[in-house]
């Protein structure tokens, strides 16, 4: 057993959670439950009253956090301690949204100053593009930007740009390419004009297979459309730490933006990786996004555990995974602009906490990262919500909704809100057999038929959920929301004593993929791998089944 599962607090939680009342009874017994189990921070409101928890539950969860020295670990991250121990790196994405006057030293260098210099360079670049000062090789202004990346350098900018659509300045269109499947980039290029298109290549090494392949294809297309090698500098910029490789490609050194080892890909949208966001919404709005995240950083660092929004959310997620057998967690966004967030949070959480050993290499004896999934309301109500309501698996849910819409059309938003709040109530309350039977009374069904149908209409309820509200979706509130989930992920990893900042599973996939690529391109059939891999490789080489 690990130290965590042997602890008195863990054992007490294990016993305590076996005898919790139904949430319906908890609400009936406490008229103040909503008031006492909700909190506000950084433009966000969190209602966590619809969780399987009493005062004792919360007390034990906070004790578990204290036992894990959570506050000390939080401070360690912000102070630049080497908490990514397997790669010997600090974890300082929070420095990307720090106040300009802050000083965060890493190896004797104030990295906040480096960040500010990069942001100034971004601002000048954004102004040059959006003002029309930057011209393409035929003298035309840029109208389209293609962002080429993979993982965090793709998903973060894409989802945030999508979420902040109401704040686009209108000067540019932006397109995102990640998948190495040629269809992805080919379909994009069909709609573009080389004379007015700018490509942003985002890769720390300037060698990530998918990103480099797509960038080389983009360059080939550009040259075939009439551009020359000398013109590449007017149509390609890079976010990378490998300046020599980028300049060899043809990118002007002045148009290369830095990346740092202390920022992981899934935390990088706040850096120059966010250049597509800044181009679409303007630098002032980009800084508002950073400011919202910074406010959540301050809250996470300074608020007591009992009032700390990321801590509360992280503890509840841990509670369901470790003590109630939950294997997944659903994120439901009741705002069309936020429809991409479940995919973003999926990468954030599952890449961070999909681990099976503690920091000292001990095999864990508890569940770690759950499957994160979800979608937008109300679409999901006519699909997978059925599983959440009546399926056998416990699936905790987060509901996210702005109180005000950017598109206040007729009764749309009030209907959206009624569905959101109604779903949280239905999940908590459920419907027992007597209630279901009573609903059928007076129908044309026989007594036996009513008794049977009533069983099918029973919903157990007691399904936990959080509800996160904001006045309106803005760059600032979006920044706070994303930082909230970043820190929620950290909380769980810190208590589990795992490394939330490496991704060796991803690295293994890259390595084996490169090995298979060589075999696919070889002159002879594959014979040295397992029979399945050999068979698949050779079938691909033949081009038919």
Swiss-Prot record:
EC number(s) from the headed UniProt entry: 5.3.1.9
MF annotations from Gene Ontology: carbohydrate derivative binding; glucose-6-phosphate isomerase activity; monosaccharide binding
Active site: 351 (proton donor), 382, 510
Catalysed reaction equations from the record: alpha-D-glucose 6-phosphate = beta-D-fructose 6-phosphate
A GO CC annotation given for this chain: cytosol
Keywords carried by this UniProt record: Cytoplasm, Gluconeogenesis, Glycolysis, Isomerase
Compartment annotation: Cytoplasm
UniProt record, GO biological process: gluconeogenesis; glucose 6-phosphate metabolic process; glycolytic process
Ranges in a coiled coil: none
InterPro entries associated with the record: G6P_Isomerase (IPR001672), G6P_Isomerase_C (IPR023096), Phosphoglucose_isomerase_CS (IPR018189), SIS_dom_sf (IPR046348), SIS_PGI_1 (IPR035476), SIS_PGI_2 (IPR035482)
Top-level taxon in the UniProt lineage: Bacteria
Pathway: Carbohydrate biosynthesis; gluconeogenesis; Carbohydrate degradation; glycolysis; D-glyceraldehyde 3-phosphate and glycerone phosphate from D-glucose: step 2/4
Pfam families xref list: PGI (PF00342)
Its job: Catalyzes the reversible isomerization of glucose-6-phosphate to fructose-6-phosphate.
PANTHER family referenced in this protein's UniProt entry, alphabetically: GLUCOSE-6-PHOSPHATE ISOMERASE
NCBIfam families reported for this sequence: PRK00179.1 (NF001211)
Sequence similarity: Belongs to the GPI family.
Identification of the protein by name: Glucose-6-phosphate isomerase
Gene: pgi
